[in-house]
Structure formats: C-alpha cells, structure tokens
Amino acid sequence: MQQLLIASRAIEQLLSSIGRIAAWLLLPMMLVIIVDVITRKFGLLTITKDFFLATEMHGAHNIVNKYITSTKMQELEWHLHAALFLLCMGFGYVKNSHVRIEIVREKFDVYTKSWLEVIGIVIFIIPYTYLLFRYGLNFTERSFHLNEVSAALTGLSHRWIIKAFLPLGMALLFLAALAVLLRNLVFLFGSKEES
C-alpha cells in the first residue's frame, strides 16, 4: 500500500507542476483580450494600417494585415482559454478544488465519501477520459493531415495545435483520477499509518 501512496504523490506532484506552469497562460490570455478589446473599441488596427499605407511602409502594413487581425485575436483568446482549462483540469482535481454537488455527499461519513469517489472514478472518469483521449487523438490527427485552418478567412492556421490539447488534457485528468483513486484505495484498505 505504501507504493500506491508514493505513486499517488508522484502523480500529484507532476500534475501540480504542470498546473502551476500552465496557469501562467492566464497572463498572455488577459493581454490578448485587453489588446483585442482596445483595438476594436478605438479602431486602432484600422488607424495603424492607414498610417503604414500613408507613410508608404507597405511591409509594416502587410505584417499588421497578415498577423494582427481582430479574428486572429479572438481565436487566440479561446485557444489560450482552452489550453489553460485543459492543462489545469487534472491539477484542480488532485487539489480537490473542482465544483462538487454536496447535497447527498455531505451527509456521509469519510469512508462512504471515499467509496463514492472510487465508484465515480471507475464508472465515470476513467471511461470518459479514455473515450475523449482516444477520439481526441483521431480528431487531432485528422486536423493535422488535412492541414486544417480556421473557418474564418483571416483566422489562425494550424488548428491541430489547439485540438491536441484535448487528448493531452484528458491524459492529465486520467492521471489525476488515478492519483485520487490510489489515495482512496490506501485510505480504504491500508493501515491507519498509511492513510
């Protein structure tokens, strides 16, 4: 049982490290949102493009026109948001910081709660993460081979990159479920010192 606890803690440390690093995606996401809102509100992209055209800096105009569009900014916002969510989901689960509906669960003792957690992991989380991981890989691979781009004319290319976060996030959530499962098994079947 001690090995299960060691494995659980190792997985939790890995997920904590990934979650803490991924949480930094919040800063570029906020920056992109702020820039997008300000440029759309005040029409700064149009002003910038007009300035470069008026001063005959066509190279700079082409860069702004090609790389910085409102559509690309909006798509980058949701790409960063999806990556942040998927990379931190496992971290949230091992830290028990996700939302729970405590209507029924709060009335039970610790052992019953632990059994509910084990049953929930085995019946719901493991099959769910497996299916989304498996189909997410196919989804990503198909996108990569088709060289899928945004449906918007001026949107982001390489759509497979964001789609790859789905199987990655599900793998991390599976690891989190495994860590919580091991921890609960040690609690239920191990000695008092181990739990």
Name each model feature, range by range.
Residues M1-S195:
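Alpha-helical transmembrane segments and membrane-interface helix-loop junctions
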